[in-house]
Amino acid sequence: MTSDDDNELMGRARKGDLDGIGILFERYHGSLVGFFRRVDGRGKIGEDLAQETFWRIVRYRKSFDGRRPFRAWMFQIARNVMNDHLRKSMRAGKVMDPRVELNEELAAQPDSDVSAEVERGERKELLREALSRLPLEKRELIVLCRFEELPYAEIAPMFGCSVGALKVRLFRALKELKEVFIQLGGEKTA
């Protein structure tokens, strides 16, 4: 799977052949759900937001510019979907608690070494909690760079900066994440 293939599929979609979008959906659905889960902290909403992202891809397919990789365009739309979702959630007064889903995931794992799973779950929960305490832009940056592994050159335009400035922002975001993670770990053990 190359960005040329993705761009070709989107080029066909721009002309009305929507079969390509189905292929792109299958190819990137998991990545989008993961992106939303990591940024928002709730897996169930990730599925809905991934579908909304692809709905917008279909709706705005004519605005796709083949000079930019499809994946970067898709994640820019995903960022917009996430921002819209967070605005609606804040207006509705909904509170997000990622710990509920983590406990459901642990309960669904049969025949596992319970103590190892609990320890892994605690570290995972600390990381999720630390990530959730960062500002949205820093969470998105970490998820796109470290979890989705998009190239810096594709991410920089999403944040309106150069690759060098993006690296500085990522360094600072990771440093802040580490500080929050250590802080949370200290609170948990003290």
Give the predicted meaning of each segment.
Residues 2, 14-23, 33-52, 163, ...:
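Short, charged helix-capping/linker segments at alpha-helix termini
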Residues 2-3, 92-120:
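Internal acidic/polar
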Residues 8-12, 126-134:
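Short amphipathic alpha-helical boundary/capping segments
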Residues 14-15, 38-41, 52-69, 88-90:
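Sigma70-family region 2
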Residues 25-43, 60, 131, 176, ...:
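Amphipathic, Lys/Arg- and hydrophobic-enriched alpha-helical face
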Residues 48-55, 68-80:
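Structural recognition of an alpha-helix C-terminal capping motif at a helix-to-coil junction
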Residues 59-66, 76-97, 120:
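Arg/Lys-rich amphipathic alpha helix in sigma70-family domain 2
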Residues 79, 83, 87, 126, ...:
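DNA-recognition helix of helix-turn-helix
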